[in-house]
């Protein structure tokens, strides 16, 4: 392309850009900023150390009742799976070609179980369980996996103290840097 042609193309681009100006067309109004109270309602993150755990308490016995009512249809009797993921067992499979990654065999922190159940379960009605029900279901699943006793109560104080069997088998991708 010759220099005069380049100049003509450049002038055309600049003219189009100058004529465009700010748009007076309205946006499609596809949303709005969330209010602080709306953000707070969904700010339910729980850390491995228990940061963010709400008040509440639940036992395995209480959790068994909730599990049968709200979880068993998807996760099977006593967490055995079918039609969805197994929640119990798999302890001897992690080093095999087909590991069974369950709450008891794979998950590194008990607080992660609470956090996930609270946010996402039951699948068809997430955020529908009370905090006491979530603690109870968490206790039930930990008991089924042989991690806590049947009468152990889970709460914001006790749950972070539960040592999961696979906790020490994870390699941190971004280890904490010394200060």
Protein language model regions, located:
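Sequence context surrounding c-type heme c attachment/ligation sites in exported
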Residues: 61-69, 80-84, 107-110, 128-131, ...
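Gly/Gly-Pro-rich "capping" loops immediately C-terminal to redox-active cysteine motifs
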Residues: 64, 80-118, 122
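Flexible coil segments in periplasmic/lumen-exposed cytochrome c-class electron-transfer proteins
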Residues: 124-179
């Amino acid at each position: 392309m010759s220099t005069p042609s380049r100049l003509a193309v450049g002038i055309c681009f600049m003219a189009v850009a100058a004529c465009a100006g700010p748009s007076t067309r309205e946006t499609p109004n596809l949303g709005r900023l969330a209010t602080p109270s709306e953000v707070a309602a969904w700010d339910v993150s729980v850390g491995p150390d228990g940061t963010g755990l709400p008040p509440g308490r639940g036992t395995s016995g209480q959790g068994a009742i909730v599990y049968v009512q709200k979880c068993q249809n998807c996760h099977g009797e006593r967490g055995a799976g079918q039609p969805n993921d197994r929640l119990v067992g798999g302890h001897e499979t992690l080093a095999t070609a087909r590991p069974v990654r369950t709450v008891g065999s794979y998950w590194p922190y008990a607080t992660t179980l609470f956090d996930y159940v609270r946010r996402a379960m039951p699948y068809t009605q997430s955020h529908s369980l009370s905090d006491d029900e979530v603690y109870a279901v968490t206790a039930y699943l930990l008991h089924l996996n042989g991690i806590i006793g049947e009468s152990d109560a889970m709460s914001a104080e006790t749950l972070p103290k539960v040592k999961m069997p696979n906790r020490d088998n994870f390699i941190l991708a971004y280890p904490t840097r010394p200060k």
